[in-house]
Amino acid sequence: MKVILLKDVPKIGKKGEIKEVSDGYARNYLIPRGLAREYTKGLEKAIEHEKEMERRKKEREKEESERILKELKKRTHVIKAKAGEAGKIFGAVTAATLAEEISKLTGLSLDKKWFKLDKPIKEIGKYSVEVILPGGVRDTIEIRVEREE
C-alpha cells in the first residue's frame, strides 16, 4: 500500500515522503497513530503545497535574520552595569541582559536564545559575542561593558 508520511518515521522515511509499505503495517500501525495517510493525488498536492509554504517561510525568516544581523553589526553596543573600583561587575551580564539592553538601543525585538555566551560577563571591558539567529544566520558582534555612573 502506498502511504504519505505525515511525520518522520524511523527506518521508513521523513515527513511528506511517499512510501510503499505492507497493508497491515499501514492499517494497523501508521494510519491509526497519525504517522501516515493512504496515498491520493489530492493529498500529494496538498503536501507539496505545504512544503512550498514551509520553504518560503524559512526563506523569509532567513532574510529577516540577515537584516537584523546587519543592523546589529553597524556599531559597538554599550551596556552599562554597576561595578566596583576594580572593574568587577555586581552581578553579571547574561544573554538575557544583552537581549534586553540591545533591544532598547536598536528598537529591534531580540531573543536571549540568540546570544551565545560561554559564561556570563563579570568584568568591565570589550567583548565579542556570537549571535545565532533563526535561519542559520550567525556572526559575532562587539559589545562594550562600561561602569554605570
UniProtKB/Swiss-Prot annotation:
<keyword id="KW-0699">rRNA-binding</keyword>
<dbReference type="InterPro" id="IPR036791">
    <property type="entry name" value="Ribosomal_bL9_C_sf"/>
</dbReference>
<dbReference type="InterPro" id="IPR000244">
    <property type="entry name" value="Ribosomal_bL9"/>
</dbReference>
<protein>
    <recommendedName>
        <fullName>Large ribosomal subunit protein bL9</fullName>
    </recommendedName>
</protein>
<keyword id="KW-0694">RNA-binding</keyword>
<dbReference type="GO" id="GO:0006412">
    <property type="term" value="P:translation"/>
</dbReference>
<dbReference type="Pfam" id="PF03948">
    <property type="entry name" value="Ribosomal_L9_C"/>
</dbReference>
<dbReference type="InterPro" id="IPR009027">
    <property type="entry name" value="Ribosomal_bL9/RNase_H1_N"/>
</dbReference>
<dbReference type="GO" id="GO:0005840">
    <property type="term" value="C:ribosome"/>
</dbReference>
<comment type="similarity">
    <text>Belongs to the bacterial ribosomal protein bL9 family.</text>
</comment>
<keyword id="KW-0687">Ribonucleoprotein</keyword>
<dbReference type="GO" id="GO:0003735">
    <property type="term" value="F:structural constituent of ribosome"/>
</dbReference>
<dbReference type="Pfam" id="PF01281">
    <property type="entry name" value="Ribosomal_L9_N"/>
</dbReference>
<keyword id="KW-0689">Ribosomal protein</keyword>
<dbReference type="GO" id="GO:0019843">
    <property type="term" value="F:rRNA binding"/>
</dbReference>
<dbReference type="InterPro" id="IPR020594">
    <property type="entry name" value="Ribosomal_bL9_bac/chp"/>
</dbReference>
<comment type="function">
    <text>Binds to the 23S rRNA.</text>
</comment>
<dbReference type="GO" id="GO:1990904">
    <property type="term" value="C:ribonucleoprotein complex"/>
</dbReference>
<dbReference type="InterPro" id="IPR020069">
    <property type="entry name" value="Ribosomal_bL9_C"/>
</dbReference>
<dbReference type="InterPro" id="IPR036935">
    <property type="entry name" value="Ribosomal_bL9_N_sf"/>
</dbReference>
<dbReference type="InterPro" id="IPR020070">
    <property type="entry name" value="Ribosomal_bL9_N"/>
</dbReference>
